[in-house]
Amino acid sequence: MDHQVTLTEMLDAREKRAFRQQKLLEKYHCTTICFTMNIAGPVKNNPLILRGFQLGKRLLEERMGALKIKPIYFEESNEVTGNEAFYVLDREPLMIKRITSDIEDGSDLGRLFDMDVLRADGQKVDRTELGLRPRSCLICGKSAKECSRSRIHSVLELQHRTKQLLIEAIEETDAQDAAKLAIRALLYEVCTTPKPGLVDCVNSGSHKDMDIFTFMNSASALFPYFETCVK
């Protein structure tokens, strides 16, 4: 059964997170990302939530890698009170906030991500500094802060929607990853040389209508098929 956290546990976790943020800022004097998940209800971590968190890390790290941004420091914790990751970066805060906001707004799963960006002085970078609208509610799409403040939606509604978003994103990602591996296996196989009678890097073997290039084209075209098979 999933652990249900108490108010005291959550307050302690929040205090420890704030303390850790302060220590990192004092040590590095750099832009810092604090990544957590927006999870309603008393269950803040389980295998499904952890997978969603890992997908968020993957998206963030892929985006930073594409921009050749390498963290000065990284740490992660996975407790019953939730998952946390800290990235210390020698980059301009607004640039980093643009990256994290794009991830938060770029998919349904991103609505569960809370990627705070802190300046070297500890001040949080606000979305409005980039001209972005406030984050929207998981249920109705209106302002998340307004819905939270007025408690329009029940915890059960939010939990159901959260679980739905996590499952959909994980299934989609797993299907795509499996399809990529299947395509890679086909390409590795055709590149294995020599293979008497079969298509390889130097000849077409007994095949009159295929060479390595047509094989690669055919393999690439199979991605949607493999993806559908996994689903």
Where are these regions (language model features)?
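A broadly conserved sequence feature marking short terminus-proximal activation segments
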Residues: E75-D126
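Long, contiguous binding/interaction regions
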Residues: M1-L59, E104-G110, V117-D121, R127-L130, ...
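A glycine-rich, hydrophobic loop/mini-helix early in the fold
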Residues: G56-E76
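Intrinsically disordered, low-complexity segments enriched in serine/proline and basic residues
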Residues: A185, L198-V199, A219-F223
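Charged phosphate-binding loop/patch that engages nucleotide di/tri-phosphates or the phosphate backbone
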Residues: E168-A179
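Aromatic (phenylalanine/tyrosine) cluster motif
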Residues: Y188, F213-F215, F223-F226
